[in-house]
Amino acid sequence: RHTLYCTMTYIMTFGIFAGFSAAFPLMIKNLYTPLDKSIDPLQFAFYGPLIGSASRVIFGKIADKTGGAILTHITGIALIILISGLILGGYLTPTSPDQFQGFLVIVLAIFFFTGIGNAATFKQFPVIFSESPRKAAGVIGWTAAVAAFGPFVFNVLITQSRAISGDARLFFWFLVVGCVCAT
């Protein structure tokens, strides 16, 4: 049972981080470059992973002192709010290049919080499985392997969402529900 919850929280953090790392430049290209040719996806592609990685390092030390559960919970709530804002703010169905700045801020904030959550969840696993370090190591390996599918799953499901509904909002609502369940 604990393995399932650990997997869900790690998918919420690292899975979203890895998925957005792959999908972020493509989203810019597909959503905003047609509205303004001067928006270059490659100019922004590395900022998200950089911010997420930096927040993981910085908040890893905080998670080591606090145990990680509170930071994971804060991350879940922040991701629910931010992803909902991406959908409800119209940033996934833009009508103006002026919306790009809001899109960029929200996505970079998502990267920031996934970095925090990534550090916090990895701190929790050895605590949750303190009776068996071997089990803790297995859970860390399992959750990392499952969450590593993030880039593949993100792009496949965004494509499917666009095929079904014409845009990616369906996938992102699914992501919100996943974050609610993991939080």
Predicted features along the sequence, with ranges:
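Extracytoplasmic gate region of multi-pass secondary transporters
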Residues: 2-53, 122
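Juxtamembrane helix-start elements in MFS-like secondary transporters
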Residues: 36-45, 99, 103, 136, ...
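Residue-level signature of mid-helix packing/kink "hotspots" within the transmembrane helices
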Residues: 49-57, 148, 152
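Helix-to-loop junctions at the C-terminal end of transmembrane segments
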Residues: 55-68
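C-terminal transmembrane helical hairpin of 12-TM major facilitator-type secondary transporters
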Residues: 67-120
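Intracellular juxtamembrane helix-capping segments at the cytosolic ends
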Residues: 116-131
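A late C-terminal transmembrane helix in Major Facilitator Superfamily
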Residues: 132-165
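A membrane-interface helix-boundary motif in multi-pass transporters
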Residues: 158-179
